[in-house]
Design a protein with these regions (language model features):
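Non-catalytic C-terminal accessory modules of carbohydrate-active enzymes
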Residues: 198-201, 229-233, 246-247
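Carbohydrate-binding/catalytic loop surfaces
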Residues: 2-23, 51-53, 57, 76-98, ...
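Generic structural signal for residues positioned in beta-strands
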Residues: 26, 79-80, 177, 195
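Aromatic-rich carbohydrate-recognition surfaces in CAZymes
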Residues: 1-77, 98-106, 189, 235-247
Length: 247
């Protein structure tokens, strides 16, 4: 994904150390919204170039976006965090896992299965449903902390966003995306959103996490570089408020 400069079919490859785990998954928010607005289901069959070379249908671009994250997973089989997920301060690498991206992948798989069904592509729909069932099992086994969903798992196995870790126990993104993606069961949905209200809600909006980071190693969580209550260290982001509203 090239958000700032894009010459289709002519861009240099992104070096692996700069891969971001969330970038290609925003297609699953943007493209279905475009198709719903225009009514043009045929857009999924339109052939468009890749960033560097080659071309394929929009649907194939979506499949490739999913495969990118399915091919890069950590010790629990959840998506790798890579250079960053949406949170630029979170440095998880290839072995650390992003629960936020797991929810993005879940939404992507569910969307892909629905689109493939509507395009009369049963094999593609079945593939997505199988991957979805596998991911759901991993999410339920690894990511629920009792009252909310965890944030991430570091390369060394440290769990962030758990009641057992003293900082950043509750993370807004994983609560609201658990609901948006459909990963949360009904009891989980109700409880994690109650936790958002109890722990993150302020008169100015929902904070991104609570409590802020003060002692967590900076190599993994660069939010610790910011004052508590600012930016990714417990600040209030306009972008995340919209997700909370959707949830």
């Amino acid at each position: 994904i090239k958000p700032w400069l894009h010459k289709p079919g002519q861009m240099p490859l992104t070096p692996p150390e700069k891969y971001r785990s969330d970038d290609c998954l925003w297609f699953f928010n943007a493209i279905p919204a475009y198709v719903a607005e225009t009514g043009d289901l045929g857009f999924y069959r339109k052939v468009l170039p890749y960033s560097d070379a080659g071309e394929d249908t929009v649907l194939a671009h979506l499949r490739r976006a999913l495969q990118f994250n399915l091919d890069r997973t950590g010790r629990n089989g959840l998506p790798s965090g890579l250079a960053a997920d949406w949170n630029d301060c979170l440095k998880l690498g290839y072995r650390g896992e992003s629960v936020f991206v797991a929810f993005q992948v879940r939404l992507g798989l569910a969307t892909y299965a629905d689109v493939a069904h509507r395009l009369a592509l049963p094999d593609e729909a079945a593939w997505a449903q199988r991957e979805l069932a596998t991911l759901d099992e991993k999410i339920q086994r690894v990511c629920w902390d009792g009252d909310w969903f965890i944030w991430a798992i570091g390369e060394d196995g440290t769990v962030f966003g758990t009641h057992r870790y003293p900082e950043g126990q509750v993370y807004l993104n994983t609560q609201v995306w658990a609901v948006i993606s459909g990963a949360a069961t009904t009891p989980q949905r109700d409880r994690c959103l109650d936790t958002v209200r109890e722990r993150l809600a302020t008169e100015w909006g929902a904070a991104i996490c609570d409590p802020p980071f003060e002692k967590t190693p900076v190599a993994v969580m660069r939010a610790v570089l910011f004052n508590p209550g600012s930016k990714e260290n417990g600040g209030i982001f306009s972008h995340t408020q919209s997700w909370a509203v959707l949830a």
